Amino acid sequence: MSARPTPDVDAALVLGMASTALPFAGSREEEAERWLRILRLYGDAGAALQSLGVSEGPLEGAGGNGKHGAGAGDDTDVLSAVSEVAVRAAEGRGAPTVAAGDVLVAVIEVYGEDFDRVLRVHGTDRAEVLERLGVGRG
C-alpha cells in the first residue's frame, strides 16, 4: 500500500491562503473568485491560468448574481472537500504529492457551476483550464 499524497509547497500555500480568505466571502461564487485569485499565483495551476490570460481582475463586470449568503457556509467543510478531491487527483496521476494543479481540479469539481461562472468572467472556461493542465475533460 502506497502512502497518501501530501501537498507540495505550492498546494500547501494555496490551501493555507484559502483557509484565511474564504471566511470573508459572502457567497459560493465569491469563494470561487478567491480560490481563482490565489491559484493563479502558484505552481502548475498558476502557470496554466496565466497562460490563458487570467489576471487579478475580471474581464467582465463581476456584479450580479453572487447569491450573497447562499452557500457560503462552513469553510472547514469546503476546504476538506477540496483537499480530499485534490488528493484523489494526485493519486490519479500516480503522484507522491498534491500539486496546485490538483487543487485547481478539485476546486473545479467542488464548486461546479459557481467556478465555471468565475472562469467565464475571467475570459476562459473549464475545458481550456483542464486542457492546459493536461487533464482529461471533466
Task: Please tell me what each predicted stretch does.
Residues 1-138:
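Histone-fold recognition with a strong bias for associated Lys/Arg-rich disordered tails
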